[in-house]
Amino acid sequence: MTLVDVRTPDPKRFIPGATGDWEIVIGLEVHAQVLSNSKLFSGASTTFGNAPNSNVSLVDAAMPGMLPVINEECVKQAVRTGLGLKAKINNRSIFDRKNYFYPDLPQGYQISQFKDPIVGEGTITISLGPDRQGNFEDIEIGIERLHLEQDAGKSMHDQHPTMSFVDLNRSGVALMEIVSKPDMRSSDEAKGYLTKLRSIVRYLGTCDGNMDEGSMRADVNVSVRRPGEGFGTRCEIKNVNSIRFVGQAIEYEARRQVAILEDGGVIDQETRLFDPGKGETRSMRSKEDAHDYRYFPDPDLLPLEFDDAFVEALKVDLPELPDDKKARFVADLGLSVYDASILVSEKAIADYYEAVAAGRDAKTAANWVINDLLGALNKFGKDIETTPVSPDQLGGIIDLIKAETISGKIAKDLFEIVWNEGGNPAEIVEARGMKQVTDTGAIEKAVDDIIAANPDQVEKVKAKPTLAGWFVGQVMKATGGKANPQAVQALVKAKLGIEDE
């Protein structure tokens, strides 16, 4: 594969060294576990967390005479992912044997795809920002290829003081290896790319993206160079299992390589691992090249072939993807690019928002989901799937505000009650006497009392009418936040002789 440099050097991406600026070049190889009930070449279950060696067929264990049979659903999932990446779908692809020895690889080789992958070149667009002016920077990252392959088993070294064990539950599970082009120039870009890729496969339903369970992990290729020069020698950091760790690994590895080069040394092409505890990478082994694996077509598998109709049938059923959904939220619902970007970042968040916004003001719904719901989820370490406030409950709170049954301040208190205790918002308001005070007589008395008690403040307002907000706040405080804010403001202005602008 010939690497092509498509990025113009950008000074704001450079990292400073003792002898001048350096540029990082990053490419990612992401292994995404295919969402399917059975493995790539056997009928064994793919359920995560089962007892060791309980999801193993004779094919997975490489028993003599056992032949692989392709799982059609895994093929469909790979094609769906390729379509979601705007990539070329190859109607003919070939499975190869990648030969290497490892205890948890019972066949002595991995069935993968080398020269003829199922998916060719594609693109992902990421957005970085916003900057101080509120602008976003869109960057297009190239996809080199996507191919199907088997996962290996798992070596277990913590079960016995003197022995290691092998769990083959993962052996033969279908993986999509999604290989980017070396188009990223900072850790933020790499994190943005991985975040966007995870979002896309989750929208498509082709991978759950749960990095903590190992169903998505990244091999990170990092090199450094002087701006404008050719590619440097790269090192590959294997099996990084969180987006945050990807960023940390890149930052450390780039600094390590710069220090070596500035000291007059050379970078060895090698495979490294990232130690999250120490925040550093360390050497594992010298980096293999393709010829070291002695690829050749698997004689037990015919070439994988399908026609255009097969692809089109999958294409028509694709869901709306993040970029299209964001564009619709901006164009049809009038949301800002910033708000739309947050809401489409995860399919579950977008689905939640659309349920809340149905039949309601889109911007009001967005404000509540982003500021109140997501803020609370972040504060208490929860995610959208485990939120204690359902879309119906949040929608009910918004309805009560619109009907002027409660004020904005009371709505915040109501949200907290629903979060902690659950329940129907309207019934809670009724039972706890939280309804907004709309009786103008009662509000007028409260305004009169505040004005009478603060003659000095009245004089200040006459000199500076914008200070009238102080009186509004005092009245709201005196009424426990139950007074209608608009009615309070109108009465305060009338009593103080302030004309509307």
From Swiss-Prot:
GO MF annotations, alphabetized: asparaginyl-tRNA synthase (glutamine-hydrolyzing) activity; ATP binding; glutaminyl-tRNA synthase (glutamine-hydrolyzing) activity
EC number per UniProt: 6.3.5.-
Top-level taxonomic group: Bacteria
Keyword annotations of the record: ATP-binding, Ligase, Nucleotide-binding, Protein biosynthesis
InterPro entries documented for this protein: Asn/Gln-tRNA_amidoTrfase_suB/E, Asn/Gln-tRNA_Trfase_suB/E_cat, Asn/Gln_amidotransferase, Asn/Gln_tRNA_amidoTrase-B-like, GatB, GatB_C_1, GatB_Yqey_C_2, Gln-tRNA_amidoTrfase_suB_CS
Pfam families tied to this protein: GatB_N, GatB_Yqey
Protein task: Allows the formation of correctly charged Asn-tRNA(Asn) or Gln-tRNA(Gln) through the transamidation of misacylated Asp-tRNA(Asn) or Glu-tRNA(Gln) in organisms which lack either or both of asparaginyl-tRNA or glutaminyl-tRNA synthetases. The reaction takes place in the presence of glutamine and ATP through an activated phospho-Asp-tRNA(Asn) or phospho-Glu-tRNA(Gln).
Protein name: Aspartyl/glutamyl-tRNA(Asn/Gln) amidotransferase subunit B
Organism: Agrobacterium fabrum (strain C58 / ATCC 33970) (Agrobacterium tumefaciens (strain C58))
